[in-house]
Amino acid sequence: MIITQEKNKQVVQSHDFDQVNCTIDAEDMRYVASLLRNNYSKPILAVIREITANALDANLEAGSKKRAIVKVPSSFSPVFSVRDFGGGISKEDVFGLYSKYGKSTKRDSNIYIGAFGIGKFAPLSYGDNFTCTSYHNGYKTAYNIFVDENDDTKIVRLHEPELSNEPTGLCIGVAVAN
């Protein structure tokens, strides 16, 4: 989704005042990330909506005709999961792109639902962690995305990449409370 911004804004000042661009220091990012994680009034619906929308976008981006697989929790498997058939994500992109709040690859087209780069973290509005399993270039790699004791969002790779015959894509899993 293309995010439109006013491009012809003209700011006129009566004097050449001292000024500075406002930024966020790395050590303060945890507070902003916490606000972004907790901005949903209905976290359960947000998880379903955001993860499903990302799966639809991933399939579209990859040209996949397969439907995303949505699994609802049960007493035998108390996990909500969505499996897409997009391109999957390399370790470099998980650590360099997926890990960044506000980073999105979908801002150049209106065919995608997402664009703000925060929906991927929606599961953290419901619980303190979720899993992301990537099927990419013939390998399967699982990651745990969690909020640590300092309220920082972290991603840890759970194992070395394993050979896989599974189709490319991502599977996001969110454990649910009883």
Q: Regions from the language model: what does each represent?
A:
Residues 37-41, 45, 83, 87, ...:
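Alpha-helix N-cap/helix-initiation motif
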